[in-house]
């Protein structure tokens, strides 16, 4: 899955169903949520960049990752200001801010106003929506 070379406009639902696990497809295309403490990146400490599992867009840097205690990978900011889109989510009887990949519209997770300085934000992201690429040493 880490060698995705699809470009915007070329990613089809069929190609994602073939390439992604059923769980990753449910999270990214159906706005699902993985169980807390189950994802491969919630306790991950390597240096590098977390990319979108669907389109390979860079999303988050390990430099901005922190342990929120939530059971999901958490970041206080994205890798760039245009990496994400945020939309209002009123599902499950709550009002939240849903985080999506700006390139391919994959569901990533949610952002909350309870993170650390300097932003005060907590991007709570499903591991299943991410693909980590280690920094070159």
UniProtKB/Swiss-Prot annotation:
GO BP: protein repair; response to oxidative stress
Catalytic residues of the enzyme: 124
The keyword Endoplasmic reticulum is assigned to this record: no
Protein EC: 1.8.4.12
Cofactor: Zn(2+)
Record keywords: Metal-binding, Oxidoreductase, Zinc
Catalytic activity annotation: L-methionyl-[protein] + [thioredoxin]-disulfide + H2O = L-methionyl-(R)-S-oxide-[protein] + [thioredoxin]-dithiol
Signal sequence, start to end: none
Gene Ontology molecular function: peptide-methionine (R)-S-oxide reductase activity; zinc ion binding
Sites where the protein binds Zn(2+): 52, 55, 101, 104
Pfam families referenced in this protein's UniProt entry, alphabetically: SelR (PF01641)
Note accompanying the cofactor annotation: Binds 1 zinc ion per subunit. The zinc ion is important for the structural integrity of the protein.
Residue ranges of domain MsrB in the record: 13-135
GO CC, one annotated term: cytoplasm
Oxidoreductase among keywords: yes
InterPro entries assigned: Met_Sox_Rdtase_MsrB (IPR028427), Met_Sox_Rdtase_MsrB_dom (IPR002579), Mss4-like_sf (IPR011057)
Residue ranges, annotated region (Disordered): 1-33
Family according to the record: Belongs to the MsrB Met sulfoxide reductase family.
The protein's name: Peptide methionine sulfoxide reductase MsrB
Species the sequence originates in: Thioalkalivibrio sulfidiphilus (strain HL-EbGR7)
């Amino acid at each position: 899955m880490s060698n995705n070379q699809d470009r915007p406009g070329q990613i089809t639902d069929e190609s994602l169903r073939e390439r992604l696990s059923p769980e990753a497809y449910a999270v990214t295309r159906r706005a699902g949520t993985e169980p807390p403490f189950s994802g491969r990146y919630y306790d991950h400490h390597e240096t590098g960049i977390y990319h979108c599992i669907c389109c390979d867009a860079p999303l988050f840097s390990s430099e901005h990752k922190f342990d929120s205690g939530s059971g999901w990978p958490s970041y206080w900011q994205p890798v760039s200001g245009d990496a994400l889109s945020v939309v209002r989510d009123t599902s499950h009887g709550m009002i939240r801010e849903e985080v999506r990949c700006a390139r391919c519209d994959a569901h990533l997770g949610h952002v909350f106003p309870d993170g650390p300085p300097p932003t005060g934000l907590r991007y709570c992201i499903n591991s299943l929506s991410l693909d980590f690429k280690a920094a070159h040493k």
